[in-house]
């Protein structure tokens, strides 16, 4: 890669000053400006948009304290069954390389008027949560509790830090060892809503679904979700359909293995996006016509008749007409 840090398309090359395997198949990357300059500020819960060596664009959450302006820290789980971005990061990037990144964005910010926080993380979903915890410890006196679910100790990212003195009495780490019957029982946590408490959950879709199911009686707006990537294999019955763009009249075909958002990009049509898992709301689009299978975790029931999250949701019938 070129030694110049300024790249095209809004990306800047940051130097990888350290790469460390912090758990089995999970790598931490520390990034800094090549000339030692301060980096653009970010807030807890933010993510970096990264152009990985194979050319893909991926989002990775920042895990360090936002007060640290001299570096960004991300963690990547190598997933051989994923879309290739994590494998390219794990296998092709080494300390000393330049990695193209865009300015941090945040669709998962902490609520300013909260009295306390409950954090739920699964697997690599710990990354934005850890940034939030570090921020709260360094800058506030607000109480919080983390429930972190992983398969086993070897797959637990940041385990030593979480069990250290800094977070004493604020962290519960649970291992299910691959047995669903041994999953953590969250009902005692969410049985009784607490005024001013906000819940932040990041992890695999089954974990988020479980938290969503158990918090239906909580006040609206008090439960927040974030996830990067979506497992389309859980929708084995995907069927192709068509999308008509209402403003231009363009017709697009959506195959079983591509999302509306991906097909728009393939055709040079820009649409806002961030998480690409139906949890942040960035790709909310007005629906003009059609019957939608809503797969997001954002839209309320009263919004589903005229809106769609184009990163995950699909058509129940043959054609959707969108206000694009």
Curated annotation (Swiss-Prot):
The keyword Electron transport applies. The lineage of its organism: Bacteria, Pseudomonadati, Pseudomonadota, Gammaproteobacteria, Pseudomonadales. GO terms for biological process: phthalate catabolic process. Residues 241-324 form the 2Fe-2S ferredoxin-type domain. Pathway: Xenobiotic degradation; phthalate degradation; 3,4-dihydroxybenzoate from phthalate: step 1/3. Its EC number is 1.14.12.7. NAD(+) binds at residues 115-229. GO terms for molecular function: 2 iron, 2 sulfur cluster binding; metal ion binding; monooxygenase activity; phthalate 4,5-dioxygenase activity. It comes from the Bacteria. SUPFAM superfamilies: 2Fe-2S ferredoxin-like, Ferredoxin reductase-like, C-terminal NADP-linked domain, Riboflavin synthase domain-like. This is Phthalate 4,5-dioxygenase oxygenase reductase subunit. The gene is pht2. This dioxygenase system consists of two proteins: phthalate oxygenase and phthalate oxygenase reductase.
